[in-house]
Curated annotation (Swiss-Prot):
Binding positions (ATP): 59-66
Transmembrane regions: none
Catalytic class of the enzyme: transferase
Annotated keywords: ATP-binding, Kinase, Lipid A biosynthesis, Lipid biosynthesis, Lipid metabolism, Nucleotide-binding, Transferase
Organism the protein comes from: Vibrio atlanticus (strain LGP32)
Annotated family: Belongs to the LpxK family.
Protein known as: Tetraacyldisaccharide 4'-kinase
Length: 335
């Protein structure tokens, strides 16, 4: 319901306005004072000895940040850089922190997004609720640039380049701050961001267009690949920021979807619940982020759909140029 109020101008918004508007003002005051305290030096910040790139957004919910992080990592790897990724690890229950992932680290320890990034890219990934500690853990891993998955509002960690990812369809909704609207920070915050990335919509102003390109569905148990259109009677579920985006993608791929189920972002899945859900069709399909959480008990008819961020060549070159400038400032040219 809250997203309908934020993004769809639901009539209930006007009844809740007297309650939510003062709370939004309070949120603006507290978050603004917090940011000013870090930027003015009143609160301590950490300046890593290597470049830091932040990928985040100013709205609550999923906007496509993790695919952008993966794209950045792979692009930098292709140009001879050695990126490492840090994350807060939402939903993670690590035995200790900071946690540097290896290929066998379970998603329950790292969180779903760090596990996915490590699996897709092979890059060093560290998780810690205090991102500075995650960065310090990667300094011995041979990295020469840090990318943070989310953290635009984590001002305790100093940064060199900022990306803000925008949901191209829903954009900023009511353009009000939480809880009256979806904004974590005022719209004016975007003026300070280096790169605005429009995910799946028409770019405005200086925004760069980005699309998520789906590939073939992958079987969780065998690794077999098939087109979504070939899979009959699909049960689709998604535990991401905006599940309807995933369901729309399946529709665009001519998927034979007979049932959909949305879950909360980063939600821990119940094994029995998913097994029961799978019985509603012949095959079950999920996002790649969800797949890393249920690999161990997947059935033969469970599939996931990988997606990859796509930028045009001009956008990629502008981004790469800026990163190289920062890398050269730190004395870390590509090999």
């Amino acid at each position: 319901m809250i997203e309908k109020i934020w993004f769809n101008n639901h009539p209930l918004k006007y009844f809740l306005w007297p309650l939510l508007w003062p709370l939004s003002l309070l949120f603006k005051m507290i978050s603004g004072q917090r940011r000013d305290a870090y930027l003015s030096g009143k609160k301590e910040t950490y300046r890593p000895p290597l470049p830091v790139i932040v990928v985040g957004n100013i709205t609550a919910g999923g906007n496509g940040k993790t695919p952008v992080v993966i794209w950045l990592v792979e692009m930098l790897q292709a140009h001879g850089f050695k990126p490492g990724v840090v994350s807060r690890g939402y939903g993670a229950k690590a035995p200790n922190y900071p946690l540097v992932l290896d290929e066998n680290t379970p998603a329950e320890h790292s969180g779903d997004e760090p596990r996915l990034i490590r699996k897709r890219t092979g890059a060093p990934v560290a998780v810690d609720p205090v991102r500075a500690n995650a960065v310090k853990a990667l300094l011995s891993e041979g990295v020469n640039v840090i990318i943070t998955d989310d953290g635009l509002q984590h001002y305790a960690l100093e940064r060199d380049i900022e990306f803000a990812v925008i949901d191209g369809a829903r954009r900023f909704g009511s353009e009000c701050l939480i809880p009256l609207g979806p904004l974590r920070e005022p719209m004016s915050r975007l003026d300070d961001v280096d790169f605005l990335v429009n995910n799946g919509g028409k770019a405005h102003g200086r925004e760069f267009s980005m699309s998520l390109l789906p590939s073939q569905a992958v079987n969780l148990k065998t690794g077999q690949k098939r087109s979504v259109a070939e899979l009959q009677k699909l049960v689709a579920f998604a535990g991401i920021g905006h599940p309807p985006r995933f369901f729309k993608t399946l529709e665009n791929l001519d998927g034979d979807v007979v049932y959909t189920q949305g879950f909360a972002d980063h939600q821990d899945f119940d094994k029995d619940e998913l097994h029961a859900l799978a019985k509603k069709g012949m095959n079950m399909i999920m996002t790649e982020k969800d797949a890393v959480k249920c690999e161990e008990y997947a059935q033969d008819n469970w599939w996931y759909l990988p997606v990859s961020a796509q930028f045009d060549e001009d956008s990629q070159q502008q981004i790469l140029k800026r990163i190289k400038e920062v890398m050269e400032y730190y004395g870390s040219p590509s090999t």
